[in-house]
């Protein structure tokens, strides 16, 4: 339709023709085509109810590239939600917000002199952000997501390398601790800005939490213009999904649907009493 009939209609109306038409491949269920007859259909409203809108948006956009078919399954959604969103992104946001509250009374500090580990983080964040931005500009959202996650992993590694809980015990390391907190927030801001097309609501909530701007012109600039902002209350961005509990709930819902479908139906004895004219 969009490459044959739509251009014909536009030409007939004298309207300008599209310069680019975006398409995407198939979405498979457990690497198989979805079909009602196979009983492997998934519906958007059910997925949103089970996992949340942003988690589903992220899964689909990070799973489906333009080159190959995408695959969807409950197990795959749970795995990506738990690893990418709960462990890598959500945990980083939660830890950073908690440490700023604990060590600086909730006020985001300004950075001071850099050390080698700081410079390494800045270079990694900028490199991954540029790679992600360039891919997003070409609509390669799946590939871009890989670089955003790599950026977040670098921030989590930065925490392990700098051990802020140890710095907090030594007053002479106060400025080092300021650097760590400020640069963690800058890393989160960069990832959150890039995540906006994937998870708009989550990105907005994280931006409000730290009070930072997610404008693209500030992407990975490391000027930390949010210093002095007060960190808000941080709940869990994404709760980890217990696979066993999910399977139990899924089986219960399937049983209830089957029971509901049988309601109102008559058995063979009742059918035999029916007079067909």
Language model features by range: what are they?
Residues 1, 36, 47-49, 77-88, ...:
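Secondary-structure capping and boundary motifs in well-ordered enzyme cores
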Residues 26-119, 210-241, 245:
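Catalytic adenosine-cofactor/nucleotide-binding cores of aminoacyl-tRNA synthetases and other
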Residues 7-9, 57-64, 189-193:
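Short, hydrophobic/amphipathic alpha-helical patches that form generic packing surfaces
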Residues 19-26:
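Long, charged, glycine-rich C-terminal linkers/tails
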Residues 69-74, 126-134:
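Short, charged/polar, low-complexity loop and linker segments
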Residues 93-132, 152, 156-173, 248:
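Conserved, charged catalytic cores of large soluble enzymes
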Residues 3-13:
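Short active-site loop/helix that positions an aromatic residue
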Residues 134, 138-139, 149, 153-277:
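Basic, alpha-helical terminal appendages of large translation-related enzymes
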